[in-house]
Each structure stands twice: as C-alpha cells, then as structure tokens.
C-alpha cells in the first residue's frame, strides 16, 4: 500500500521518506539516506546514474584545461554515419538556455536542428549541465547608478560586446562559399570569438571551450547547408564532422591565395618597361607572375601575356608594338628576345658615347687666353704661324689680289698644327682663310 501511494504521488516522496525514516527504528550504523534505488523516483535515479558515471568514468576532451573550462564526459552515442550533418543533436535550444549562451540574444530562436558531435564534446544525458563560461552575446545590464550621473558616468565593460549581432546570410551556392565564409568569420568576431579564429598565418590565441565549439558547430550548419559546401569542405567534415576550425583555417589560407592572385593580375595588367632596368630582370619578374598564376590553376596564354607586355613598352621599345600588331601567333620567348636585343644595343651605344665625345673635343681645340698684361695678347688657333713682317696695308693687298695664294694658304692652314703667335700693339693682324680683322 505504501509503495502504491509513493508511485501515485511522487512529488511528496521526499517528505514521506523523511517521515518514514524518522518513525522507524534504524540501527546506529546504518546511513539514514541509504534508500533503495527502487524506492527513488525516476529523476532521482537518473541523477544518481549521472553522479556515479562522473565519479567512475574519467572525462576526455580535446580542449586543454583552463579555469573557464569544464571537461565534458564521453557520450555513449553510435559512431557517425555517412551523410549530411548526422542525426544527433549537439546543443538544443533548452541546453543553450541552460548554459546561459544567447543565440542572437534569444537561445530559443536557434533555427538549427539537432546535430551530432564527437563523444569528446557532448554528453547526451538530458540532465547533464553544460558549463557556464561565456556570458550572453548581448551586453549585460549595467550596474545601478544614480539618475543624476546617468549621462556623466558610463560603465566600461572589460570585454567589448555588441547588443545586436548581425547573423551571416545563408549559403546559396558552392561558388559563393569563399564570400560567405568572410561574413561568417566576421560574425564570430562580433560574437567575442575572434581570439579562437585562425589568423593569416593559421595561428590562434587560445583553444576554444566546449560551449564555444558547440556554438560554432551549430551556427555553421544553420547557415551553410551541407549539399552547398565545396568538395574540400565536405572531405574535412567526412573525416571529422565537428572540425569547423580546420575549415576556417583553410578558408583563411585560401583568402590569402585569392588576394595574391588579384595582386598578380593587377601587376600583369600594369606592366611598364622603358629600359631603366635590365631585360633579364624584367623577364624574370613577368615569368614569376605567370608561373604563380599557373600554380593556382590560372593559365595565361602567350598571346595575352604579349599584349599586356607590349601595352607597357615605352622609349626605344615602343616600336615593337607595330611589329607585333599584325602577328597572330605571338610567342612570349620571342618577345623577350627582341626586348633583350634592343636593351643590349642601347647599352653598347651608351658605353661608346663618352669616348666619341672625347675625340670630338680634341679636334675642337679653339681657345683664347688674355693675360693680365696690357702690352701682349696670347691667341691659340689652328693655323700655320707666319713670320711676315710686312706692313698691314701690304698684307691686305696681297690677300685681296692673289686668289691663288688664298687657296694655297687655306689648304696649308687646314693641315697646320696648333701654334702661338705673340703680336705687338702695332702688328696685330693675323692670317685666316678669309680676311678678318681682330
């Protein structure tokens, strides 16, 4: 009769048990709380099972121990099956509410279904409490302050959080995954999870906790349907369906590769060459860009490469545009050979220019010096020195009347060497190819 009453009214069990224990005679060596498991209600038996399991089974976790983390216990769930994001749940809305983790400020608004996770991260028992570590994404209510100082004093939060976290859009196609993952990473950073996201070098500042891993897993599946994921993402999730961090790490690496591809295309489209650098250096630069694009499955044809190079030629290399304008079968190696030939010719001409200028200056040796003295003048000219002492009028008469003498004298002057003649104040007339007075 007593057992039937207990089953009919399980909520009054603790009071009845206490009364029966105190009313009956209990030996002194018996624990008054040692009640048979059959007399306990169902939820007490479940809690006893959980406590015994926690005491006997050591916890395993892939996350290092820290003062925020509570290692969950292994789950007795079946191994993952092949398929789309398996059938067991990772964090239900009720558990998210129990863990004090707000999903866009309202954990009950989680649009994702039940997902499966690794036994190292999930305890399937419904009464297993999740660790409470991260506060809700919404900013906690500030400390009460006086209404007078409400506008003057603003409490400073230790961790910057946002009231409204904009969720990423849902992935619509496999080709848009690289764009979608940028919004998803931004969403995680706005959710105070930026320190567990890999940087450009693939490094993270700290290991994520169980609750953080559950949150990332749920949100990733909620906005990225499995059938729209790229092949390389599916391959990672087929090995470890909860390894979202590896997906993010490789996504960041691919972003860097895509940025390099964009830089290479910009550099190739803006090529310029005027001969200021060596032709070998220019060829190596262009070949390196083309090879890097080829490694990323982007093939640049010889015709396209030649057109981009010809567009940036200037100076003595500009005439190659007309030479290759009518060619249909352009070879990049041939264009580099033409550029190298012009560069070598210009280099040889630049080396010969100083010697030619020096030889020209030797023949152009015309100078005049005037000493400080007022009685004498020194002149240096390319004509033959004459010892004529005739008067000025006689010299002028001879030059004007004798054309033969003029022609012979001109030939003789051109073959003469440099000489100096000292003229006095009275005799300052000198002979030249044409009559000229100094």
Swiss-Prot record:
Keyword RNA-binding: yes
Residues with site note (Cleavage): 397-398
Subcellular location per the Swiss-Prot or TrEMBL entry: Cytoplasm
Domain of life from the UniProt record: Eukaryota
Keywords assigned by UniProt, alphabetized: Cytoplasm, RNA-binding, Transposable element
InterPro entries named among the record's database cross-references: TYA (IPR015820)
GO cellular component term of the entry, any: cytoplasm
Assembly mode: Homotrimer.
Note: Retrotransposons are mobile genetic entities that are able to replicate via an RNA intermediate and a reverse transcription step. In contrast to retroviruses, retrotransposons are non-infectious, lack an envelope and remain intracellular. Ty2 retrotransposons belong to the copia elements (pseudoviridae).
Protein name: Transposon Ty2-DR3 Gag polyprotein
């Amino acid at each position: 009769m007593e057992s039937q009453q207990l089953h009919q009214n399980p909520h009054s069990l603790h009071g009845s048990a206490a009364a029966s224990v105190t009313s009956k005679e209990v030996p002194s060596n018996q624990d008054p709380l040692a009640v048979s498991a059959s007399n306990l209600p169902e939820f007490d038996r479940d809690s006893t099972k959980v406590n015994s399991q926690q005491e006997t089974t050591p916890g395993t976790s892939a996350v290092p121990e820290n003062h925020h983390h509570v290692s969950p216990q292994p789950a007795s769930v079946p191994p993952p099956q092949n398929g789309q994001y398996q059938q067991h749940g990772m964090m239900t809305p009720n558990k998210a509410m129990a863990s004090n983790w707000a999903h866009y400020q309202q954990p009950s608004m989680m649009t994702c279904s039940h997902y499966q996770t690794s036994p190292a991260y999930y305890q399937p028992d419904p009464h297993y409490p999740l660790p409470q570590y991260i506060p809700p994404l919404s900013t906690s209510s500030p400390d009460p302050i006086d209404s007078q100082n409400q506008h003057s004093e603003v409490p400073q939060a230790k961790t910057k959080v946002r009231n409204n976290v904009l969720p990423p859009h849902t992935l619509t196609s496999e080709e848009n995954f690289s764009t979608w993952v940028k919004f998803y990473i931004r969403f995680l950073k706005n959710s105070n999870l930026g320190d567990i996201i890999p940087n450009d070098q693939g490094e993270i500042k700290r290991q994520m906790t169980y609750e953080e891993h559950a949150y990332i897993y749920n949100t990733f599946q909620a906005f990225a349907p499995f059938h729209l994921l790229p092949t390389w993402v599916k391959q990672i999730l087929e090995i470890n369906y909860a390894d979202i961090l590896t997906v993010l790490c490789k996504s960041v690496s691919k972003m860097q590769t895509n940025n390099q591809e964009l830089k290479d295309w910009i550099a190739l489209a803006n090529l310029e060459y005027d001969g200021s650098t060596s032709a070998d250096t220019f060829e190596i630069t262009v070949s390196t860009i083309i090879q890097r694009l080829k490694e990323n499955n982007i093939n640049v044809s010889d015709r396209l490469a030649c057109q981009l190079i010809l567009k940036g030629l200037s100076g003595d290399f500009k005439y190659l545009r007309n030479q290759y304008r009518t060619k249909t079968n352009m070879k990049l190696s041939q264009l580099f050979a033409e550029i190298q030939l012009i560069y070598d010719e210009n280099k040889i001409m630049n080396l010969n220019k100083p010697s030619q200028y020096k030889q020209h200056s030797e023949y152009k040796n015309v100078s005049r010096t005037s000493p400080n003295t007022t009685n004498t003048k020194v002149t240096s000219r390319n004509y033959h020195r004459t010892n004529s002492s005739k008067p000025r009028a006689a010299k002028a008469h001879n030059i004007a009347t004798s054309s033969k003498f003029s022609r012979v004298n001109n030939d003789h002057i051109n073959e003469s060497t440099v000489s100096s003649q000292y003229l006095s104040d009275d005799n300052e007339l000198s002979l030249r190819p044409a009559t000229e007075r100094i």
